[in-house]
Amino acid sequence: MNIQQAIKQIIKKQDLSENEMHKVMNDIMTGKTTDAQIGGFLVGLAIKGESVDEITAAAKTMRSLVKSVTIKNTKHLVDTCGTGGDGLGLFNISTACTFVVAAAGGSVAKHGNSSISSKSGSADVLKAAGVNLDMSVEKISKCIEKIGIGFMFAPFHHIAMKHVIEPRKDLAIKTIFNVLGPLTNPAKVPNQVMGVYAQSLVEPIAYVLKNLGSKHVIVVHSKDGLDEISIADDTFVAELKNGQVSTYTINPADFSLPLGNLNDIKANNADYSLVLIQQALDGKDGVAKNIIALNSGAAIYVCGLANSLQKGVNKALNILNSDVAHQKLDDFVRESTDC
């Protein structure tokens, strides 16, 4: 199937098979299609609604083209990358979680990018902290093995994405590519906490990750619109564990945490985002610390360092009340230049 045939099919609201989607995506990612064809295809998919099989096939295609990072020990390997796109301008929560999870004994292969829809992307805040982002795949692997943290800058690893940059920019709408980033971690992490920008994606993405061979995953979207576990409202969860997907809702009160005001954790730039992160890692009580505890606790749970979400959050709070997470940030800044 070529992209023109695919467009004709999806505008009839007919899903593509995995094989059909793989063929079209491979043509797109290897430069065999025009910008107009890519735009028409992405809009058609968005209007029809991307199926689990279509997202699975697209992710498999991107994974086959990625510049990968090899990690020898994947037992407690996890990523906290989300889709972004919530438009709320909060500080970099998932990036902050990296240091808490590493302090708990996990290995975090953090996949991320510069700012797209937010005021500060994960790459921006890490750069503000002094982290060297220009690392080879070998250096990234060594950092993860040595200190439990590595950062994979998406444009460096997903070179084939250059073929869709202009069509996506011209369309200026959410497309399948908004969810593909977190699904295509270059280190092939078996465990993830993945935030998504819409509630309708929570359960389907859990099934996509099941199809991709993930081990333990939590996919989240909060009632107040975050692609994170919220400190201010209920959060919808789909959990993949032992090959089964279950759905449920959680609230900060479930973890004996007070509701927080999201206005307290908005960051207009990377520097202020870093300030909020450092204060929380130093144990300063408040909304930033509590939302980091919720999200890093989930990552601690899925990577096998706690046997329940509650215990994961408790472990995260204990770490935040010490200085070990901030020490991990300092370690990463230092090691990123010479490990």
Swiss-Prot record:
Covalent S-S links between cysteines: none
Record-linked Pfam families: Glycos_trans_3N (PF02885), Glycos_transf_3 (PF00591)
Pathway entry: Amino-acid biosynthesis; L-tryptophan biosynthesis; L-tryptophan from chorismate: step 2/5
UniProt entry tagged with the keyword Nucleus: no
Amino-acid positions noted as binding Mg(2+) 2 in the UniProt annotation, renumbered to this chain: D227, E228
Cytoplasm is among the record's keywords: no
GO biological process entries: L-tryptophan biosynthetic process
List of residues binding Mg(2+) 1: S94, E228
Primary enzyme class: transferase
Cofactor note: Binds 2 magnesium ions per monomer.
Residues engaged in binding 5-phospho-alpha-D-ribose 1-diphosphate: 82, 85-86, 92-95, 110-118, 122
Binding site for anthranilate 2: R168
Catalytic activity: N-(5-phospho-beta-D-ribosyl)anthranilate + diphosphate = 5-phospho-alpha-D-ribose 1-diphosphate + anthranilate
InterPro entries given in the database record: Anthranilate_Pribosyl_Tfrase (IPR005940), Glycosyl_Trfase_fam3 (IPR000312), Glycosyl_Trfase_fam3_N_dom (IPR017459), Glycosyl_Trfase_fam3_N_dom_sf (IPR036320), Nuc_phospho_transferase (IPR035902)
GO molecular function terms listed in the Swiss-Prot or TrEMBL record: anthranilate phosphoribosyltransferase activity; magnesium ion binding
Cofactor list: Mg(2+)
Alphabetical UniProt keywords: Amino-acid biosynthesis, Aromatic amino acid biosynthesis, Glycosyltransferase, Magnesium, Metal-binding, Transferase, Tryptophan biosynthesis
Residue ranges that the Swiss-Prot or TrEMBL entry lists as coiled coil: none
Subunit structure: Homodimer.
Protein task: Catalyzes the transfer of the phosphoribosyl group of 5-phosphorylribose-1-pyrophosphate (PRPP) to anthranilate to yield N-(5'-phosphoribosyl)-anthranilate (PRA).
UniProt cross-references to NCBIfam families, sorted A to Z: trpD
Family affiliation: Belongs to the anthranilate phosphoribosyltransferase family.
Protein name, entry field: Anthranilate phosphoribosyltransferase
